UniProtKB/Swiss-Prot annotation:
The modification N-acetylserine is found at S2. NAD(+) binds at G201, L202, G203, G204, V205, G206, D225, K230, V294, G295, V296, R371. The modification N6-succinyllysine is found at K235, K341. Its main location: cytoplasm. The gene is Adh1. Belongs to the zinc-containing alcohol dehydrogenase family. Class-I subfamily. Zn(2+) 2 binds at C98, C101, C104, C112. SUPFAM superfamilies: GroES-like (SSF50129), NAD(P)-binding Rossmann-fold domains (SSF51735). Binds 2 Zn(2+) ions per subunit. Disulfide bonds: none annotated. This is Alcohol dehydrogenase 1. It is an enzyme of class 1 (oxidoreductase). Its cofactor is Zn(2+).
Length: 376
C-alpha cells in the first residue's frame, strides 16, 4: 500500500534536552510539501558534530531529531521536485546546493546562501516549519537532514541521487565525515604530488584527510595524535609517520619543522581545538605552507594569531563539507568509491541496529570507534 501523501508513523531517536540520552520515540512524519522529499533511511553514521549538539556546544533548537550523515531511498516527493523520484537511492545534504545563488555560482565556494540551518539553526525546513511531531508536539529538524529517524523529509536542494548499486551502509559516510576530510585535502588545500602533509587528529575525518593526501600523491604524510592506538589505522590508510606530541618536550610545530626542512607544505587541524589550530598553522612552511581548519571549534570562541605568521606567505583556510558543492560532488564521490578509487570500509569500526544509538555515542565519547554506522 502506497504511503505517498499520507502521514507516516515510525521510530526516531529524539533528543529532548542537552546532555541527555536519546529516546526512541514513535513519531509522525508529514508528507513532503512542494520541493521537498521524504526519505526512508537505511543507514546513518554517528558524527562528532551530532555529539556537539547533544552537549550544547553546537546550538540547535530542541527537542530535535539529530543525525546528518545518512543514506536512504526516496519514499515520495512533493510538487515540483525533478531531481529525484520514488525508489531512488539518495544521500541527504547538510550543506545544500540551490545552484542559483551567488555562492553556488562562485567557482571557489560551496556554502550555498540557503545554508541558514548551519549558520543560524532554526530547526525547520526552508519554509520555516517541521514535518516531525511526537505526542502532539512539533519536533525540530537538524541542519537540513535529521537522519536519526526511519523516515525524514528534506528540501530538494538538500538531497543528491546516487548510484542505484551503491551500498548505503558504506556510502552514508560520504554524507559528512569522509567528504569533509577527503575534500579538505583534494579540494580545499589542493595537495600536490610529492608534497609533505601533517594531519592533526585521527578520528574518522582526520583519517579521511590522510586518504585524501595519499590519493593526491603526497610523499610524506605525518599523522599527529595523543592516542597511539590510532597509529596503526593511520598507517594502513597512507600515513608515512605517526607522532605523539606528548613524547616531546618542545612544541609540536617545532618538531614538524625539523622533520620537514622548515615546515610541511600542507597541514590540517581536524580536532576543533584553538591551540592545535595555531600549532597546525605554525607547522606549515612560513613562506609557502597552507593550513586548513577542518575541526569545528566550540561556539563563541575566538583565536588570536601574530600577523607575522601569515605575512611571509602562509595561507590559512577553512571549509565546510570539504569545499565540495554537495549536489554536484556527492554522486561523483559515490561513483569514485564504486570504482575503488578510495576505501570507506576501514573507517567503519562498528555497525549497530538503530535502537542502540546511545551505545554508539558511548563508543564515540570513549574514543573506541572511528565510525559507527546505525542500520534501520
Amino acid at each position: 500500500m502506497s504511503t505517498a501523501g499520507k502521514v507516516i508513523k515510525c521510530k526516531a531517536a529524539v533528543l529532548w534536552e542537552p546532555h541527555k540520552p536519546f529516546t526512541i520515540e514513535d513519531i509522525e512524519v508529514a508528507p513532503p510539501k512542494a520541493h521537498e522529499v521524504r526519505i526512508k533511511m537505511v543507514a546513518t553514521g554517528v558524527c562528532r558534530s551530532d555529539d556537539h549538539a547533544v552537549s550544547g556546544s553546537l546550538f540547535t533548537p530542541l527537542p530535535a531529531v539529530l543525525g546528518h550523515e545518512g543514506a536512504g531511498i526516496v519514499e515520495s516527493i512533493g510538487e515540483g521536485v525533478t531531481c529525484v523520484k520514488p525508489g531512488d537511492k539518495v544521500i541527504p545534504l547538510f550543506s545544500p546546493q540551490c545552484g542559483k545563488c551567488r555562492i553556488c555560482k562562485h567557482p571557489e565556494s560551496n556554502l550555498c546562501c540557503q545554508t541558514k540551518n548551519l549558520t543560524q539553526p532554526k530547526g525547520a525546513l526552508l519554509d520555516g516549519t517541521s514535518r516531525f511531531s511526537c505526542r502532539g508536539k512539533p519536533i525540530h529538524h537538524f541542519i537540513s537532514t535529521s537522519t536519526f529517524s526511519q523516515y525524514t523529509v528534506v528540501d530538494d536542494i538538500a538531497v543528491a541521487k546516487i548510484d542505484a548499486a551503491a551500498p548505503l551502509d558504506k556510502v552514508c559516510l560520504i554524507g559528512c565525515g569522509f567528504s569533509t576530510g577527503y575534500g579538505s585535502a583534494v579540494q580545499v588545500a589542493k595537495v600536490t604530488p610529492g608534497s609533505t602533509c601533517a594531519v592533526f587528529g585521527l578520528g574518522g575525518v582526520g583519517l579521511s584527510v590522510v586518504i585524501g593526501c595519499k590519493t593526491a600523491g603526497a610523499a610524506k604524510i605525518i599523522a599527529v595524535d595523543i592516542n597511539k592506538d590510532k597509529f596503526a589505522k593511520a598507517k594502513e590508510l597512507g600515513a608515512t609517520d605517526c607522532i605523539n606530541p606528548q613524547d616531546y618536550t618542545k612544541p609540536i610545530q617545532e618538531v614538524l619543522q625539523e622533520m620537514t626542512d622548515g615546515g610541511v607544505d600542507f597541514s590540517f587541524e581536524v580536532i576543533g581545538r584553538l591551540d592545535t589550530m595555531t600549532s597546525a598553522l605554525l607547522s606549515c612552511h612560513s613562506a609557502c605552507g597552507v593550513s586548513v581548519i577542518v575541526g569545528v571549534p566550540p561556539s563563541a570562541q575566538s583565536l588570536s594569531v601574530n600577523p607575522m605568521s601569515l605575512l611571509l606567505g602562509r595561507t590559512w583556510k577553512g571549509a565546510i563539507f570539504g569545499g565540495f558543492k554537495s549536489k554536484d560532488a556527492v554522486p561523483k564521490l559515490v561513483a569514485d568509491f564504486m570504482a575503488k578509487k578510495f576505501p570507506l570500509e576501514p573507517l567503519i569500526t562498528h555497525v549497530l541496529p538503530f535502537e542502540k544509538i546511545n551505545e554508539a555515542f558511548d563508543l564515540l565519547r570513549a574514543g573506541k570507534s572511528i565510525r559507527t554506522v546505525l542500520t534501520f
